[in-house]
Amino acid sequence: MGINIRSMVQNNFLKTIILAGWLTINIYLLTSTYLLYYKSDKYHYLYMVLKESICVSRACAMAINFNLALILIPMCKTIISWIRTKLLKYLHSNPRRLVNHLKGLHILCAFTMCILSVIHTLSHLVNSLRFHLNFTEAIEAINVASSKKETTLWLVLSKVPGWTGVVMLVLLAIIVLTSFQAVRRQNYEVFWYTHHLTIVFLILACFHGFGKITKFQTNLDKNPRECHSLVRKMWKENSTICLEAPSFESNVPQTWKWIVGPLCLYIIDRIIRLFRAVKDCQVANVQ
């Protein structure tokens, strides 16, 4: 019994450490991003318009970025095989065995992305509704809507994050549904070809953030948080600290920074595999 427990600990120790690290990073990204949009002064006006839905949508987006960065790594089979046979051959068997089980990390990241993507989408639908309902000319610069007449559906489908998000959600559903074991057993080609839609998904993800949806205040020194109650009044006449109206700037897209490294690795891996596939094979000996 003692030997079995010790063997189980030895065999699963590194796997448990990796899983705990993955979970810790996800929790950190979710909580830190949520609190940033909830408490930060530079996002105060955005929070006034959208409330908790902007916190939830941005928190999920950050965790999705992290899982997007990880999901391609197990797919680099040639590079992983080289690492296992060349770099880890002198190490204990646990690291090499862990490399062989990276498929589990790929599946874990995929299902996590599905859950987070649904929450992210629903939160952005609420954001669009609140952009429409809370439109005011007093802080028009913070709003994606240009007038009260723009409907929620129009705000979703007319903006880059909206229509790319819809397409990405459909692609993700196709990729995941065709990945189940029942589909792979009946028609592996369907699984194989639909899985290549991941590249389209990643390309869309790179452009998903170029819609200038989330904005932060840039002049907190001349318009601190306390000035928000004076948005309908003349700034200079009502307060000595509110020297001017709030000004805003759009966030810089971040998703492509998470994806570009793993995507380049995957492209290199596929090029190596393609080169090996077309390379002539010579028979050295026949017995």
Sequence positions of predicted segments:
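FNR-like FAD-binding dehydrogenase module
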Residues: 1-287
